[in-house]
A protein has these predicted regions:
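C-terminal transmembrane helix and the adjacent membrane-cytosol boundary/short C-terminal tail
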Residues: 2-12, 171-186, 196-198, 254-288
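Interhelical loop and adjacent transmembrane-helix boundary motif
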Residues: 2-6, 49-57, 219-276
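Transmembrane alpha-helices
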Residues: 12, 17-24, 108, 160-173, ...
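Short membrane-interfacial helix/loop motifs at transmembrane-helix boundaries
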Residues: 22-56, 227-232, 288
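Membrane-interfacial helix termini and adjacent extracytoplasmic/periplasmic loops
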Residues: 37-38, 46, 111-159, 193, ...
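Hydrophobic alpha-helical transmembrane segments of multipass integral membrane proteins
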Residues: 59, 63, 67-79, 83, ...
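Short hydrophobic faces within alpha-helices
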Residues: 62, 87, 104, 180-188, ...
Length: 288
C-alpha cells in the first residue's frame, strides 16, 4: 500500500512539473527552429538569435532594462542596507510594525503598486509646472516646467519595490551578528564608521549580495509596474515582448524569452547556491 502511495505521489509530482515546464521547454526548442512556425520543426538554426541581435528596438529595450536594473540594484542595495541597520538598532516594539509595513509591497499585487505609483507621478507632475514657473521668477536658475513619465519614473519605481527585498535579505544577517563585536571594535579605538566598514559590512556581506541579486532579478523580470510607470519614451524588454505578442508570436519572441528565462534562472541558481553554502557554513560553526 505504501509503495502504491509513493508511486502515485511521484507520478503526481511528475505531472505537475510537466504541466509547469513543458511550455518553457517548447519555447526554448522552437527558438532554434529554422522555420517561422511554432508548431512544425524545420531544422536547427540560430537564425532567430542572429535576427534578434540585429533588431534595433529590441536591443534598445535590452539596454534600458539592464541600465534600469543595474542602477536600481545599486541604489536599492545601499538604501536597503542602511534601512536594515536602522531597523536593527530600534527597539522590537518599534521595529516589528515597521517590518510589517516593509513587507507590504512584496505581498501587494503588482498591478496595485503600478497604478498607485502612476497616480503619484501624475499628481506630482501636475503640480510641478506651477512650482517651476514660480521658482523661475526668482532668477536663481531655471527648472523645466514640463515633466513626463519616462526613464526617471521607471528607475524610481524599480528602486521602490526592490528596497524591501534588500531589507529582508540583510535583516537576518544582522540578527545573527554578535552586538559585542561593534562595541569591542570601538573600545579598541575604531570610530563608528571604521567599525561599520571593518566589522558590520563583512558580517552582513552575504545578505547584501543575496539582496542585490534578488533585486536585479526582480528588475529584469518586472513587467506590470514598469508598464504603468515607464511612459511612452521608455520600454523594458518585458514590455517590448508584450508589444510583439499582440501582432504575432514568432520564433524571434521565443529567442528573446529564452534569453530572459536563462538569465533569471542563472541568477536564481546563484542566489540558491550562495544561501546553501551560507547555511552549511553556519551549521559547521555551530557544531564547533
Amino acid at each position: 500500500m505504501k509503495k502504491n502511495n509513493s508511486f502515485l505521489d511521484r507520478l503526481f509530482m511528475a505531472l505537475v512539473f510537466v504541466f509547469l515546464y513543458a511550455p518553457i521547454v517548447l519555447l526554448i526548442v522552437f527558438s532554434f527552429n529554422s522555420g517561422n512556425s511554432n508548431m512544425v520543426w524545420k531544422g536547427f538554426s540560430l537564425h532567430w538569435y542572429t535576427k534578434l541581435f540585429r533588431n534595433r528596438i529590441i536591443m534598445q529595450s535590452v539596454y534600458t532594462t539592464l541600465l534600469v536594473s543595474l542602477l536600481a540594484t545599486i541604489i536599492a542595495t545601499v538604501a536597503g542596507t542602511f534601512a536594515a541597520i536602522g531597523f536593527y538598532a530600534m527597539r522590537r516594539r518599534v521595529r516589528n510594525p515597521l517590518m510589517t509595513v516593509n513587507n507590504i509591497p512584496m505581498m501587494n499585487a503588482d498591478v496595485v503598486t503600478g497604478v498607485s505609483m502612476c497616480l503619484l507621478f501624475v499628481a506630482f507632475f501636475s503640480g510641478w509646472g506651477s512650482f517651476a514657473s514660480w521658482f523661475n521668477t526668482l532668477g536663481l536658475f531655471r527648472l523645466p516646467t514640463h515633466l513626463t513619465m519616462g526613464f526617471g519614473t521607471l528607475l524610481i519605481a524599480h528602486i521602490t519595490f526592490n528596497i524591501p527585498y534588500v531589507i529582508l535579505s540583510v535583516g537576518p544577517k544582522l540578527r545573527q551578528m554578535d552586538r559585542n563585536l561593534v562595541d569591542a571594535a570601538m573600545d579598541l579605538g575604531c570610530t563608528w564608521m571604521q567599525a561599520f566598514w571593518k566589522v558590520i559590512i563583512p558580517e552582513i556581506k552575504p545578505g547584501i549580495v543575496s539582496g542585490a541579486l534578488t533585486a536585479f532579478t526582480m528588475s529584469i523580470d518586472d513587467f506590470v509596474i514598469s508598464y504603468f510607470t515607464a511612459g511612452s519614451s521608455s520600454s523594458t524588454l518585458a514590455m517590448t515582448i508584450y508589444g510583439m505578442t499582440k501582432k504575432k508570436v514568432t520564433p524571434e519572441i521565443n529567442a528573446i524569452s529564452t534569453l530572459l528565462f536563462v538569465t533569471v534562472l542563472v541568477l536564481l541558481a546563484v542566489i540558491n547556491v550562495r544561501e546553501a553554502r551560507q547555511e552549511r557554513k553556519l551549521a559547521a560553526e555551530q557544531r564547533r
